[in-house]
Amino acid sequence: MGDAGSERSKAPSLPPRCPCGFWGSSKTMNLCSKCFADFQKKQPDDDSAPSTSNSQSDLFSEETTSDNNNTSITTPTLSPSQQPLPTELNVTSPSKEECGPCTDTAHVSLITPTKRSCGTDSQSENEASPVKRPRLLENTERSEETSRSKQKSRRRCFQCQTKLELVQQELGSCRCGYVFCMLHRLPEQHDCTFDHMGRGREEAIMKMVKLDRKVGRSCQRIGEGCS
């Protein structure tokens, strides 16, 4: 009986307090339920952190070893016979010094003008301008007229110097200004310089009858003229 009373007289022990201020328990490491749950969440992260770092280092080392193996496999050793020769490159690629004079000569040949002689120029001008020919002929005829000497006596033929009578002088006078006998009075016989054909054409044109066309121009009513 005395022991029971002594136990009852003892005060019950209080549970420990959590750092947050709530009551904890010995099962939860003297922490409340919330703090204990947070502690459990943090614990696996702390445990997995070194493991993940170790796994990453292992993977990196494996990748480096695999890369080294691949490079050792893919890089073949070239024999001296397979290596490219420098002479082949020099043959295929033309140098600028060789191409330079070729282009210069081509430009020079294009730029240099062709020289023409004076004879060819005069021939081309004569062929291109046919209108100038009659003028040249007229100039030559005038020079021939001036070169001919004047007839001293009109009683003799200018060609054969035979004596002419008065009737023969009148019949043998030519438009070129000279007097000829009956044998040389025609223009074809004494190389006449006068243009008889041109003069005949001009005279024919002057003698042509010009018609005055009055049909359709005057408008008169019937009976106006009679009145």
Swiss-Prot record:
Zinc finger extent (A20-type): 12-44
Zinc finger AN1-type: from-to: 151-200
Coiled coil: none
Region (Disordered): 41-100, 113-148
Residue spans of biased composition, Polar residues class: 49-59, 78-94, 113-127
Binding-site list for Zn(2+) 2: 157, 160, 181, 184
Binding-site residues for Zn(2+) 3, renumbered to this chain: 174, 176, 190, 192
Biased composition regions of type Low complexity, renumbered to the chain: 66-77
InterPro entries linked to this entry: AN1-like_Znf (IPR035896), AN1_A20_ZnFinger (IPR050652), Znf_A20 (IPR002653), Znf_AN1 (IPR000058)
Pfam families: zf-A20, zf-AN1
Keywords: Metal-binding, Zinc, Zinc-finger
Keyword Metal-binding set for record: yes
Amino-acid positions noted as binding Zn(2+) 1 in the UniProt annotation, renumbered to this chain: 18, 20, 32, 35
Gene Ontology terms for molecular function: DNA binding; zinc ion binding
Compositional bias (Basic and acidic residues): 135-148
Ion transport found in the keyword field: no
Protein name: AN1-type zinc finger protein 3
Provenance organism: Homo sapiens
Gene name linked to the record: ZFAND3
